[in-house]
Each structure stands twice: as structure tokens, then as C-alpha cells.
Amino acid sequence: MDPRLPAWALVLLGPALVFALGPAPTPEMREKLCGHHFVRALVRVCGGPRWSTEARRPATGGDRELLQWLERRHLLHGLVADSNLTLGPGLQPLPQTSHHHRHHRAAATNPARYCCLSGCTQQDLLTLCPY
């Protein structure tokens, strides 16, 4: 076996490997974040569930504190799929044409839904931090 063969293989496969791995994620790249991936990214960018200065009491549970903060910011509503959709008496479902507009209007006002549908940058997530 020729000792130069591994070197040639590396020269030929090196660029292919770099190309296959793709570009490294940058803060400007949009990433679709849904459900717990959105929450984890938000905690990673903002620093953690105990970042708030509003109450300096000991946390009984980090997850509970984070969920309460998300609920106050109206972010949790977009993470929970409401499977119990019932119409009250006399209410009719909206025509199918307006469903598209409602869907995009909800995504525009709900950051969690927007990040799931369109993707968020790190800068977008930073705007949701409480400080």
C-alpha cells in the first residue's frame, strides 16, 4: 500500500466533509424553535429561570418559576396546543378563508408561535428577556 494514499484521501475528503457539515450557526441565522426547544433556547440566551429581579425569594422549582414567567409574558399560550376547542352556543366556525389570516395574526402576536413557524434569531430571543 502506498503511504501517500491516506494523505490523498484526506485531501480529497476534507473539503467534502467541510461542505457536508454546513456552515456553523451564527446569531443572525433563523432557527425554528417549537415547544421545549423554544423554552430551552430562551433560557440559554437569557441566562436562566432565576434572572428576574422582581422577587428575590428562594425558588421552589426552577421549572415552575420559568413556566410562571412565561405565562406572565403570554409566551406559554403558544407552546400549548389546545385540543379541547369547543364553540359556545350560537357560535359558528369562521369561513376557511379567514383561517389563514387568523393563523398568521396569531403568529405575529405570539413570539413562541412565530419562532416555531418562521424561526427566530438570537437577537429575537434577546428581545424577550425580562431585563
UniProtKB/Swiss-Prot annotation:
One of its GO terms (cellular component) is extracellular space. Pfam families: Insulin. Disulfide bonds join C34-C116, C46-C129, C115-C120. SMART domains: IlGF. Residues 58-104 form a propeptide. GO terms for biological process: adenylate cyclase-inhibiting G protein-coupled receptor signaling pathway; cell-cell signaling; positive regulation of epithelial cell migration; positive regulation of wound healing; spermatogenesis. Expressed in prenatal and postnatal Leydig cells. Found as well in the corpus luteum, trophoblast, fetal membranes and breast. Keywords: Cleavage on pair of basic residues, Disease variant, Disulfide bond, Hormone, Secreted, Signal. GO terms for molecular function: hormone activity; insulin receptor binding; protease binding; signaling receptor binding. It is found in: Secreted. PROSITE patterns: INSULIN. The keyword Secreted applies. It comes from the Eukaryota. Residues 1-20 form the signal peptide. The keyword Kinase does not apply. InterPro entries: INSL3/INSL4, Insulin-like, Insulin-like_sf, Insulin_CS. Seems to play a role in testicular function. May be a trophic hormone with a role in testicular descent in fetal life. Is a ligand for LGR8 receptor. Belongs to the insulin family. It is linked to Cryptorchidism: One of the most frequent congenital abnormalities in humans, involving 2-5% of male births. Cryptorchidism is associated with increased risk of infertility and testicular cancer. Heterodimer of a B chain and an A chain linked by two disulfide bonds. This is Insulin-like 3.
